[in-house]
Amino acid sequence: QFSADSVFHWARSSAWCDSTHVLHYQISTPQGRKFVSYDADKDEMKTYDSQKTMEKALGIKPRPAYKPQFGRRHERHWMEVDEEKEAYPVLSPDGKMEAYIEGYNVVVHEAGKPYTEAKRILTQDGTIGCYYSNRIQWSPDGKYIFVCKRVPVEKRYAYYVESSPADQLQPILHKQEYAKPGDALPQHYPVIIDVTTGKKVEADKHQIENQYELEWMQWTPDSKEVTMEYNQRGHHLYQMLAMNAETGKLRTVVEERANTFVNYGRLWRQFIKDGKQLLWMSERDNWNHLYLYDVQKSKVIRQITKGDWFVRGIQRVDEENGEIYFSASGVNRNEDPYLVHYYKIGIDGKNMVALTPEEGNHSAQYTYDYRYLLDTYSKVDAAPVTVLRDAQTGKLVK
């Protein structure tokens, strides 16, 4: 079993200094730890007698100490569902107006003026059983507001007893919000409001019925549409939808269907070309791969990665040079298929480069500009090895 304290002479706690090609790390030895920095551009290495000395020499600001909060008044269960009712204001792009929820409805107000003055109520149909969510989004041009009507449901709880609390003799009954199979879930129905005229358009509820989630709302740069992702309960259907700001009509940009379930936790997306194209990750061919979409035509332009292997994650999309940096497993046939390697590939699906070719499970740290790559790799039967690579070619630098 690997133990970081019993394996010596490997780089640990490594990191790049901000906006530089200077690396700092520690080396464990039988005599203690060594503190080292390395300038990749100058091929210059320096050692220090302590962590504090190294941080001072390199201008590294020490991390603030974590201060845990104790006592029951600080407790909060992470499974509590946000009711989206808090009335905090959302500023318009030009900073002149702010929108917020008041009495279940959407209100706009001139920024900087008293809240009793210069406000305009944009909606009047919000109720306790179907109110406007506080997750308000202004369009980039400030003309529209996107918001959802939220239909809440009765909260369901799981109860458990803390039999021996540390600060009292009596047991404590806890409850945790927990929706069980078949329980009703909150529903969200999109609305777009013209701030000047007050005209509002609503999406067709039948296109987004039986929601598990409706999330990832985002305006397009031209303020013509709002994209969102609809996860139907049961996870057999997952769609990226686009809502027209003038008509409220929903159209499907991307659709994922599965007889078993769509692994929505693996999905990843990024708009490029000013929102005209979309990078999308999907398991639709039974392997997790990247696809390029034409957003307006709702069509796949190409599958970027393909094969009997799977993409693990995306580190960077270099739109200027048309490249994607990603991690993957299973590319090398004669290896354990779960070992992680790092690659780059063109958005055109060509010129895939293995940046970490050695057999092993790799962990990569790139410089801010992706000029260098610090690569640490190991296996269950091999101690960690750390090398410096050219992040464009994968060639060893040191």
Name every feature range the model reports, one short phrase each.
Residues H24-T29, G95-Y104, E110-A111, F146-P152, ...:
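Beta-strand C-termini and the immediately following turn/loop, strongest in propeller blades
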Residues A4-F8, K56-K61, D82-E83, G126-S133, ...:
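Short glycine-/Asp-/Thr-/Trp-enriched loop segments that recur within the blades
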Residues A40-D41, A111-P114, V195-G198, A245-G248, ...:
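Short loop/turn segments that connect beta-strands within beta-propeller blades
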Residues V153, Y157, P165-V300, R312:
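Beta-propeller domains
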